[in-house]
Amino acid sequence: MMRYGSAATVTTSETASSQKPGGVCRLRLTLPAEASLRPKQEEINRDTSVNADIRSTNERRKKRNGYVLSEKNTAEPPTLHLYTIPKNNTPSAVASSGVVYGVVQRAENNHQNEVVVYEWSTNQLKEEMNYIKDVRGTLEKIREKMFGEYDEMKQKVKQLTQEIKVSSVQKEFLESHSQAQSTALDTFGTINSSLNAASIEMQKTLVDMTLENTNIKDEMKNIKHSYEESLVRLKEKQQLLDSAQNENQLLKVKIESSQEANAEVMREMTRKLYSQYEEKLRQEELKYTAEKDMLVDQTRQYLKAIEDASEKVRLAENKIEERDAKIAELDKLVHRMEQEREHLQDQLIRHEERIQDLDNRMQMQSPDRNQRLEEVATSLRERIKHLDDMVHCQQKKVKHMIEEIELLKKKVHYKDLLIQQLLERIAFLEGENTELQDKVDYLMANKPKTDKETKDIGTSCNLSESQRILTVCVTENEARSIFSI
């Protein structure tokens, strides 16, 4: 084994021929780092010895991890050998300074002439030998522990085989028990079919809900599209009003510049322009009222659609509550099934104990009967296992149904938020419409009824009408801009 933390690493290996004539001791050696100052031949031998010792330590680590039980069973020869050669051919000759000289020679046939001489202190060799003895003792303890565990496992296997053989007694009781198990399996089959039907109904309702959600999405897209179109129309009308306002300003400038020169011509022109702009204003007012009525109708339709959607959401919530109640009933049923399974397992354990007592008394007098009872017991165990699988499957189904209901609740909550936002926007638009209507009514009420008196009656009339047109255009422009915002 390897010892870490020393300047030179020494590994021992006991073999059948460890005792050699002349007091020679065989050791496995890894060269120290200070040997780099030696001649070139010694460096080559050191590299080969280090590689060989790494391989040997890897093999010994595998042995220590459990691949081989003990180092004493290895039949491989050591890779390197260390021989302590006594001084003057005497077996007990050691240097006066406590140093042991060793000769390292390869065991291969093609390296018989490679020999290297090294030296170690006796204290270091003693420490390495004590470390190796401790490691061997620990390995022996581990081997004894492993063999003891193996014997315990054999005894446990024997006990288990005896317990399996013991479970083949009292045929009549087991037959009645098997009938009870078969009836329980039939009831569980009916429960499984009812659960499958409930899951199919739930899937159908989920499909209906998805279709309703898609219809609501399409309606919301149509509403958004119509709202965008109305905004575009309002922008166009606002542009027309801006152009009319600019024309009015130009006409006002022209009228002011040519008041004294062409009173009659300007009067006729202003009358024509006034009639034209008054006609345009009436048309714009009619269009505005028509668009306003259309928007009111659209808002009513939207409110109706929102009410329908809220009604559908309420129905979906009622369905979800019903499904929650069904899931609670299924949970109770699964709990009762688990309690029944535990009760049956307890009965099976008690009957097995009674069978064991009877078997100890009867000492296996009827092997055919015992074989039949063993078959019945195995069939009962299989049925119990099948029952456990069914309970586990039902629990999975219930969990999946609960997850689907939670997801559906989240979707319904999201739809409620969306409907609330739409209602807020509709209320905001209605408030803006009422505000605009109030402004228009106020401006129409404050419109001047009499013309201002000036020197030129025609110009005064034209100026008052132009001012009225300008005020109406400004109010319409403000209303359009506010509504577009």
Swiss-Prot record:
Renumbered residue ranges of the record's region Disordered: 1-21, 40-65
Regions that span the bilayer: none
InterPro entries the record matches: Tuftelin_GRINL1A/MYZAP/CCD68
Compositionally biased spans, kind Low complexity: 1-18
One GO cellular component term: I band
Any Gene Ontology biological process: intracellular signal transduction
Family: Belongs to the MYZAP family.
PANTHER family: GDOWN1, TUFTELIN
Protein name: Myocardial zonula adherens protein
Gene name for this UniProt entry: myzap
